[in-house]
Amino acid sequence: MKANPFNELEKSEKIRKPESMRSYMTIEEVQALIDTPMPHEEYEIVKCAYLFSCFCGLRISDIIKLKWNDVFVDRGQYRLAVSMKKTKEPIYLPLSPEALKWMPERGGKSSEDNVFDLPSANTIRMQLKPWAKAAGISKRFSYHTSRHTFATMMLTLGADLYTVSKLLGHADVKMTQVYAKIINKKRTRL
């Protein structure tokens, strides 16, 4: 075959990939989660890690490996120095006062200790659904929803796409544009 026959098709004739559906929490739903205790008190750390991610955008894989020596203060601003597990890209993430509220106290932990002492990934998943249900949330809910929530909240509150892309550690702004489309659809419905 000398040439790809699909190159001859008009754009309107090509099969379009469906847009990815990203589930995220509204500000009201995040508040409901804040107000709702975990069904099992010993898993309150799962709630803290989830809400921390809602306010900083880290993936669960990055929160699990987050150490106290990754947290530092630069000119009065708390930051994280994180090498993203998925992209291997190092980022320096500023922490908002809201994100800091959900970080556990360091106490006597060493700089090599994990910030969040989390149970297994399976246990985390099992604890999230009953917590969301208790908060009155019936939509699709996973740990990654917290990352989507961060992105949509940042864009809703006026952050530019490039900044949100950098905060999420995306290699390409195109990956972040999915969230901008969500915000635009949300605005047109209002």
Residue ranges: model-predicted function:
Residues 1-3, 58, 108, 137, ...:
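Helix N-cap/coil-helix junction residues
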Residues 4-60, 64, 86, 110:
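Basic, Lys/Arg- and aromatic-enriched nucleic-acid-binding interface segment
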Residues 11-12, 29, 56, 65-104:
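Conserved tyrosine-mediated DNA breakage-rejoining catalytic core shared by Y-recombinases
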Residues 24, 84-88, 168-190:
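Catalytic-site neighborhood detector that most strongly recognizes the C-terminal catalytic loop/helix
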Residues 45-47, 119-121, 138-158:
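Short basic/aromatic active-site micro-motif
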Residues 52-53, 66, 153-154, 167:
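Short alpha-helical segment immediately N-terminal to, or the first helix within
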Residues 70-77, 138-139, 159-178, 185:
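Short, polar N-cap/turn motifs at the start of nucleic acid-interacting alpha helices
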Residues 94-138:
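Active-site/catalytic core of tyrosine-dependent DNA strand-transfer enzymes
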